[in-house]
A protein has these predicted regions:
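Conserved beta-strand positions
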Residues: 23, 105, 133, 255-257, ...
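Flexible glycine/acidic-rich beta-alpha junction loops that bind and position SAM and/or redox cofactors
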Residues: 30-33, 140-143, 265, 347-355, ...
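Radical SAM [4Fe-4S] cluster-binding motif and immediate context
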Residues: 184-342, 347-349, 355-358, 362
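Radical SAM enzyme core and accessory elements
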Residues: 1-46, 95-96, 101, 128, ...
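A structural motif corresponding to the C-terminal end of an alpha-helix
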Residues: 72-81, 247-248, 277, 333-341, ...
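Structural recognition of alpha->loop->beta junctions
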Residues: 144-161, 297, 302-308, 359-374
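Acidic, low-complexity intrinsically disordered segments
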Residues: 2-249
Length: 556
């Protein structure tokens, strides 16, 4: 049965909040090609998957927990287990060691094969369990006819699960404590998972009101003009963040909201609370260009905006979020004020041709953002673009769902660019960005240093503290990393190596002899580990997340 959070067709489970619930992400391993839809090109790593994948040992490697499942588990009263990144054997062991009344499985569309296999296993080993499927995989048309599940849930899952367990779907949301990332590696070095150095994830809302035709998130949560706010006001958001600060010992927050700055009243309320409490927090946000322009630079700096994921898409696209904005000027201005940017560009829009596409990619790379994501224009089930392409008869036959993720080849017939050429163009875009702008780690250091120079004497103590916190690593490990990158690139990309050297020397001049001493000791180590890492990667080395088991509300 296809269902949504507001569906009247939900029949509550007879055991209500006494039902035993298992929530699980799809099974690993992930970074390999297999019969269940895993792909080596599509590892369980957001950055290395679709942002820094051409940067070798300089690539930022990390994993992220299944935040949606964590939100659901924290907001139901039933005894529950969350199994995150299990192996197939671990999943089987869990459903045979405990008799679960409900098994909820979450995945994305490329995970279809794994979701289907997990449903088969539950039916075999725990036949009395109710199977619920959620996440973006639920957008596949007629998914309930393709897999053996009782419910396929589209949209927001907390309210749905509460309703199913006989609880109030409109009860206030309790936010779980979530570290934004773990298992970080760069230059071949494993970075310890220290909470003080890692942002906490806050999810203020789901969905996006902009409603871009390709956007799976917007479509999944109601489409254009629709969002589901968990926290309506800046006051509510502040209380959640203050709790995280105290319990997790963090001072930075990753705001998992598709367009956080679009809700200006909420953001300004939050700023007012931060000022009154003297909070020197760093915020990592998603935003559109039109939303950013609602603020002055001083407001962004006061709010603690330290990093923005910015949709650039294409200079000739018609998306409302880009109207009347010179994105080159905007990107340069933000970075000059210490705000790091992750630009996102689409390859293969309708107007792209073999004659103009490289020029557009060069335009994108010219923004000089700290990171750059390139994604193929991809009609994903559930989106307006998918419906349009179906209506026009342009969806390609025989494309495996496991390959519909925007990082491989077109899944539709483009007017001017072939399926194979789409992959060559995408791969070139990542390589060109790396060759032109250098490692993202170098760019981050540059932006942080620009922010330090501009604001370390700012009259507001909160701002001074924040930029000092963000610049602290420039004095130590980041400077050493710059030296290692400079040496590694001297023979292969001399122009970028020179730029890195110039930045390093300026940093050492600013911060003095102690910084040079740390670089002299640590730099050669990072040079060696980065070379070792590139040798490992050349031999096919991959990384997988460990399995997490979280249990709540079980009687002792």
């Amino acid at each position: 049965m296809i269902s949504t959070a507001n569906s009247d067709s939900i029949t509550p489970h007879p055991k209500g909040i006494h039902a035993r619930v298992l929530l699980s992400s799809v099974f690993g391993p992930y970074a390999r090609d297999d019969e269940f839809g895993s792909r080596a090109i599509n590892p369980m790593e957001l950055y290395h998957n679709q942002v820094t994948r051409a940067q070798g040992s300089f690539s930022l490697r990390m994993f992220h927990r299944s935040w949606g499942l964590m939100m659901i588990q924290r907001n139901i009263s039933a005894p529950s287990t969350l199994l995150d990144f299990p192996t197939l054997e671990r999943f089987e062991r869990e459903i045979t060691s405990t008799q679960y009344d409900v098994v909820g499985i979450s995945g994305i569309i490329p995970n279809f094969g794994k979701v289907r296999e997990m449903c088969r296993i539950v039916r075999k080993l725990s036949p009395n369990s109710t199977i619920i499927i959620g996440g973006h995989v639920a957008a596949i048309p007629a998914l309930d006819k393709l897999i053996d599940a009782d419910y396929v849930v589209r949209g927001e899952g907390i309210a749905w699960m509460r309703r199913y367990l006989g609880e109030d779907p409109a009860a206030p949301i309790t936010h779980p404590e979530i570290l934004s990332g773990f298992g970080m590696r760069v230059l071949g070095m494993r970075i310890p998972d220290k909470t003080r150095d890692t942002a906490a994830t806050i999810i203020p809302s789901v969905g996006c009101a902009m409603g871009c035709n390709f956007c799976t998130t917007s479509a999944f949560f109601g489409g254009k003009g629709k969002t589901c706010n968990f926290y309506e006001s800046g006051d509510e958001l502040f209380r959640v963040m203050e709790h995280m600060e105290q319990s997790m010992k963090v001072s930075s927050f990753f705001m998992m909201d598709e367009n956080f700055l679009l809700n200006r009243p909420r953001a300004m309320q939050l700023l007012d609370c931060m000022k009154k409490a003297g909070k020197s927090w760093s915020l990592y946000v998603f935003s559109s260009a039109n939303a950013i322009r609602k603020y002055t630079i001083e407001e962004l700096v006061q709010l603690g905006v330290s990093w923005i994921w910015l949709g650039l898409e294409s200079p000739k696209s018609s998306y409302a979020k880009l109207h009347n904005t010179d994105t080159h000027v905007l990107a340069s201005e933000l970075r000059q004020h210490g705000i790091k940017l992750l630009g996102s560009t689409i390859v293969g829009l309708e107007h792209h041709t073999p004659e103009n596409i490289r020029q557009e990619i060069e335009f994108a790379v010219g923004h000089g953002t700290d990171f750059h994501q390139f994604m193929l224009y991809t009609p994903v089930p559930g989106t307006p673009l998918f419906q349009q392409m179906q209506d026009e008869g342009r969806m390609l036959d025989g494309i495996d769902l496991a390959d519909i993720h925007g990082q491989f080849k077109f899944n539709f017939e483009h007017a001017a660019i072939s399926r194979d050429e789409s992959k060559r163009l995408l791969d070139w875009a990542f390589r060109f960005d790396f060759e032109r702008n250098g490692p993202s780690l170098f760019r981050i250091c540059d932006t942080i240093f620009q922010g330090w120079k501009k604001y370390h004497n700012h009259p507001d103590l909160r701002v001074r503290q924040r930029v000092a916190n963000e610049a602290a690593k420039l004095r130590t490990t980041y400077d050493a990393a710059l030296w290692a990158m400079e040496k590694r690139l001297k023979k292969t990309n001399f122009a970028v190596s020179v730029r890195i050297r110039e930045l390093r020397r300026e940093i050492e001049h600013e911060f003095g002899g102690a910084t040079r001493l740390v670089r002299a000791i640590t730099g050669p180590i990072l040079l060696w580990t980065s070379r070792r890492e590139d040798r490992r990667l050349a031999r096919g080395k991959t990384y997988e997340p460990p399995t997490f088991v979280d249990r709540r509300n079980w009687a002792t």
